[in-house]
Regions:
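S-adenosylmethionine-dependent methyltransferases
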Residues: 3-250
Length: 250
């Protein structure tokens, strides 16, 4: 298992820039060519002048998380690099920068990336352009949102992008079990968009919410396979511990 960052180039904020700092990195994924990925410089970035994120229930603290490269996302990208390309429809939920989707897209898979952040689509378009790829399908994917904004006012507006349409043979998501979901909104969202015969991939960095999600998925007819991920630090790449969760329904 090999992935990491190569030849990072910082893109400095200029007067004409959109109001946040970004960086560009060459991401190495074993078995496929490196990907150029533009991401936020760090988790201190914030720019929501029209309250688009605020109106979707995204707080200033969570605003930058979509635009960072996360270890779980790199593990998912590595998994996608090894999957044979077929005629299946693939949906990535909570895609953030969409690294796994970009790997699949470049290999010729039929993949749709989705996220709830108002800038995720723009970053995905920029990263497809940086890698000389044709446009990738994108949709707004939100499986639950708070009733109130960070400032206490009601969440009012809807997203600019359409919701996922049709059913998918493979649905994947990395680090999506980050909060309690007693009502099972994530499992219900997956169920609504999964084909009758489908596979679900979740990379989870041991967030602690797996047990409830397992139960919710089982109630929807999904069988589970769990693989322990325990990779020591290697050549500048941080150690990683988590689970690769595979749910199948046939």
């Amino acid at each position: 298992l090999i992935f990491g960052l190569c030849a990072a180039t910082i893109v400095c904020l200029l007067p004409s820039s959109p109001g946040y700092l970004t960086q560009q990195n060459s991401i190495a994924i074993e078995g496929v060519d490196n990907l150029l990925i533009r991401s936020l410089l760090d988790n201190n970035q914030f720019h929501d002048p029209l309250d688009e994120a605020l109106n979707l229930g995204i707080s200033s603290a969570t605003w930058p998380l979509f635009g960072l490269l996360w270890p779980s996302g790199q593990h998912m990208a590595q998994r996608m690099a090894q999957r044979p390309v077929s005629v299946e429809r693939i949906l990535e939920i909570g895609c953030g920068l969409g690294l796994a989707s970009l790997v699949a897209h470049r290999r010729g898979a039929s993949v749709t990336a989705s996220d709830c952040h108002p800038l995720a689509h723009a970053f995905l378009d920029e990263n497809t352009r940086l890698n000389g790829l044709p446009p990738m399908a994108y949709c707004h994917g939100l499986w639950g949102k708070p009733a109130l904004r960070e400032d206490g006012l009601p969440v009012l507006t809807s997203a600019r992008d359409a919701a996922p349409s049709g059913l998918f043979d493979l649905i994947m998501g990395s680090d999506i079990l980050y909060e309690r979901d007693d009502e099972g909104t994530l499992a219900s969202f997956i169920h609504a968009h999964a084909a009758s015969r489908s596979e679900i991939w979740v990379v989870d960095p041991n967030r602690g919410n797996r047990a409830a999600f397992h139960k919710q998925m089982a109630q929807l007819g999904f069988a589970r396979h769990e693989q322990v991920l325990n990779h020591p630090a290697h050549k500048g790449i941080a150690a990683y511990k988590g689970r690769m969760l595979t749910y199948t329904r046939s």
